[in-house]
Amino acid sequence: MIDPRYPLGPMPQPRDLSDDERQEARAALRALPGELRAAVAGLSEPQLDTPYREGGWTVRQVVHHVADRHLNAYVHTARVLSGGEALAQPAHEEAWAALPASSFATELSLLLLERLHIHWDEVLADVTDWQQAGLRPDGSEWTLDGLLGQAAWHGRHHTAHITRLREREGW
């Protein structure tokens, strides 16, 4: 049985990507807003407020989380490309998910993701040195390759949380 926390398996470690893998990851980021929108299409308010697994976030919280983390990853990208010494410190995910903003309409985060991913992909189109790195809050390096690969996985991972819930519930 698949662990409901990791429908695509555990998060892969950041690594260098081949040119083909990089193109696939960029394509995954371009596709994510539409795939996430399709995953929540037609869900009622009670369904949006259903946890994707016992003890997990609601579908609504997952959508907002993806937008929040991808906005943060875009800022990481900007910091690396502009020579910033350290990447932005991420928000505390559990505390952030518990704030009133997590109950906003999913459309707000879906619109943010659509525009953000268009812009982010345009920025990535000009990258020539994918080994440029920034420092993570723990002091380790994170290359643009690693950031891109993990962002693509992250979007697919959370979309799968929602689609698997829909399959289980017959929605």
UniProtKB/Swiss-Prot annotation:
Cofactor note: Binds 1 zinc ion per subunit.
Cofactor dependency: Zn(2+)
Coiled coil regions in record: none
Residues annotated for Zn(2+) binding in this entry: 65, 154, 158
InterPro entries per UniProt: DinB-like (IPR024775), DinB/YfiT-like (IPR034660), Put_metal_dep_hydrolase_YfiT (IPR023774)
Record key words, sorted: Cytoplasm, Hydrolase, Metal-binding, Zinc
Residues spanning the signal sequence: none
Transmembrane spans: none
Subcellular location(s) of the protein: Cytoplasm
Presence of the UniProt keyword Metal-binding in the record: yes
Primary location recorded for the protein, binned into one broad class: cytoplasm
GO cellular component: cytoplasm
Molecular functions per Gene Ontology: hydrolase activity; zinc ion binding
UniProt-listed NCBIfam families: PRK13291.1 (NF009807)
Function summary: Possible metal-dependent hydrolase.
Family, as annotated: Belongs to the metal hydrolase YfiT family.
Subunit structure: Homodimer.
Name by which UniProt lists this protein: Putative metal-dependent hydrolase DR_1024
Organism: Deinococcus radiodurans (strain ATCC 13939 / DSM 20539 / JCM 16871 / CCUG 27074 / LMG 4051 / NBRC 15346 / NCIMB 9279 / VKM B-1422 / R1)
